[in-house]
C-alpha cells in the first residue's frame, strides 16, 4: 500500500512588533492579540489544521518568551536576535522545516475554518518546483485591507502586475527551499522571491472563496470582531 503523503509544514511569521496594534501590543506580541478571545496565531493554525497540517514552525523576536510560554513547547520556534523581515525569517528557520515544499502564513490574517479548503487547492496548483503559489482574495471579500489590490490574476491563474482580475495577497504562500538558494544572509523581504517568480512567470495564484480578515491595526480588529459577532 502506498504511504499517504504528509501535509506540508507551516511556517508562521510571528516576529514583528505589531506597532499598529498598540496599545494592545505594548504588553503582548501581535500573534497573541485576541480576536473574540482567540489569539490571532491560533486562528491561523486552526485553518491550517482543518486541512491536515500537523507541524508548525514560527519565528519570534518581540516578546518571544510570551509566545514560547503560550504554547508550552508544542510549537517549534526560531528566535531571532534581530528582526530578519519576512524572507530572512523564513530562511533562518529552514533547518527546522522538514517538508519541501512548505507553506508560509502571516499570523495577522485568517478565514473561518471549514469555509474553504484553499491550502489543498494550492498544493494541487503547484505543477513545478520553480513555481510559487500565492493565496489571493478578491477585494470585495476582504476586511482590514486599505489598498485596492496587490496583483492581478489572469484567466489561467498566473499572477501579473496589471493584467487580469485585481486580487489581494491573502498572506499565504507555498514555496520550496530552493527558492532561498541565492538569497542574502540577514534581513530581506519575501517580495524578493515573489518578484523573481513573477519575472520568470512562475508566480501563480489560488483564490480564496470565503471572507478574509486582515487584523493589521486596531480599526481592523474592531471591524473583524463586529462582523464575526453578527
Residue ranges and their predicted role:
Residues 62, 133-150:
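Short beta-strand-to-loop element that shapes/binds the nucleotide-sugar donor at the catalytic cleft/hinge
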Residues 103, 110, 114-127, 139-143, ...:
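Catalytic-core segments of class I nucleotidyltransferases/pyrophosphorylases
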Residues 31, 74-76, 202-204:
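Conserved beta-strand segments of alpha/beta enzyme cores
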Residues 15, 61, 107, 137, ...:
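Cofactor-binding loop segments of dinucleotide-utilizing enzymes, especially the Rossmann-like FAD-
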Residues 1-12, 20, 34-112, 116-117, ...:
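Conserved N-terminal catalytic core of the sugar/cofactor nucleotidyltransferase
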Residues 16, 70, 146-156:
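Acidic-glycine-rich active-site phosphate/pyrophosphate-binding loop
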Residues 26-30:
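Short alpha-helical oligomerization interface
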Amino acid at each position: 500500500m502506498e504511504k499517504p503523503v504528509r501535509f506540508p509544514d507551516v511556517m508562521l511569521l510571528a516576529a514583528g512588533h505589531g506597532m499598529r496594534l498598540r496599545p494592545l501590543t505594548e504588553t503582548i506580541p501581535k500573534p497573541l492579540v485576541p480576536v473574540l478571545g482567540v489569539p490571532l496565531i491560533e486562528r491561523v493554525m486552526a485553518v491550517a489544521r482543518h486541512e491536515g497540517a500537523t507541524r508548525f514552525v514560527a519565528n519570534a523576536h518581540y516578546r518571544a518568551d510570551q509566545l514560547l510560554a503560550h504554547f508550552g513547547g508544542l510549537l517549534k520556534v526560531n528566535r531571532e536576535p534581530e528582526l530578519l523581515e519576512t524572507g530572512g525569517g523564513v530562511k533562518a528557520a529552514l533547518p527546522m522545516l522538514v517538508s519541501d515544499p512548505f507553506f508560509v502564513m502571516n499570523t495577522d490574517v485568517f478565514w473561518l475554518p471549514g469555509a474553504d479548503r484553499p491550502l489543498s487547492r494550492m498544493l494541487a496548483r503547484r505543477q513545478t518546483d520553480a513555481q510559487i503559489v500565492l493565496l489571493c482574495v478578491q477585494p470585495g471579500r476582504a476586511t482590514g485591507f486599505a489598498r485596492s489590490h496587490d496583483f492581478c490574476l489572469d484567466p489561467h491563474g498566473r499572477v501579473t502586475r496589471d493584467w487580469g482580475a485585481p486580487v489581494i495577497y491573502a498572506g499565504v504562500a507555498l514555496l520550496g527551499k530552493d527558492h532561498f538558494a541565492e538569497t542574502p544572509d540577514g534581513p530581506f523581504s519575501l517580495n524578493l522571491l515573489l518578484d523573481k517568480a513573477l519575472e520568470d512567470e512562475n508566480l501563480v495564484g489560488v483564490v480564496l472563496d470565503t471572507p478574509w480578515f486582515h487584523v493589521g491595526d486596531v480599526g481592523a480588529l474592531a471591524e473583524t470582531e463586529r462582523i464575526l459577532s453578527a
